[in-house]
Amino acid sequence: MSNKKIIKIIKLQIPGGKANPAPPIGPALGAAGVNIMGFCKEFNAATQDRPGDLLPVVITVYSDKTFSFVMKQSPVSSLIKKALGLESGSKIPNRNKVGKLTRAQITVIAEQKMKDMDVVLLESAERMVEGTARSMGVDVE
């Protein structure tokens, strides 16, 4: 791949196993000249074990219209909602609290996300998770 020139990098968030040519995937990939169905099939095959999880994906498009993609961990807010069984965060986070995260849950989420975060210490990742939780109206132990 060293002789291929990168022409575009596309960042999307797609539910696992549910990629289809409809917006936002189709227009983003179509504008770059990528085979949309080829991407959808590859992505769905790679994410069949994580159905419904919102997954950030970075798609690299090369000059010969081929592509490669890298999946990242779900966003922290999605992991918090999943851990607490929430549909969404609070509309007024400083007044209305929608749940409470335990220290153990924070540690698990931080460990999952650490490879995507620019942190070295687990404690730093935990503080980032706590900040996201507070901004969603979730109490932190």
Swiss-Prot record:
Protein name in UniProt: Large ribosomal subunit protein uL11
Subunit comment: Part of the ribosomal stalk of the 50S ribosomal subunit. Interacts with L10 and the large rRNA to form the base of the stalk. L10 forms an elongated spine to which L12 dimers bind in a sequential fashion forming a multimeric L10(L12)X complex.
GO biological process: translation
Pfam family name, one: Ribosomal_L11_N
Transmembrane segments annotated in the record for this chain: none
GO molecular function, one term: large ribosomal subunit rRNA binding
Keyword list, A-Z: Methylation, Ribonucleoprotein, Ribosomal protein, RNA-binding, rRNA-binding
Post-translational modification: One or more lysine residues are methylated.
Species name: Chlamydia trachomatis serovar D (strain ATCC VR-885 / DSM 19411 / UW-3/Cx)
Family membership noted in the UniProt record: Belongs to the universal ribosomal protein uL11 family.
InterPro entries membership: Ribosomal_uL11 (IPR000911), Ribosomal_uL11_bac-typ (IPR006519), Ribosomal_uL11_C (IPR020783), Ribosomal_uL11_C_sf (IPR036769), Ribosomal_uL11_CS (IPR020785), Ribosomal_uL11_N (IPR020784), Ribosomal_uL11_N_sf (IPR036796)
Gene Ontology CC entries for this record: cytosolic large ribosomal subunit
Function field: Forms part of the ribosomal stalk which helps the ribosome interact with GTP-bound translation factors.
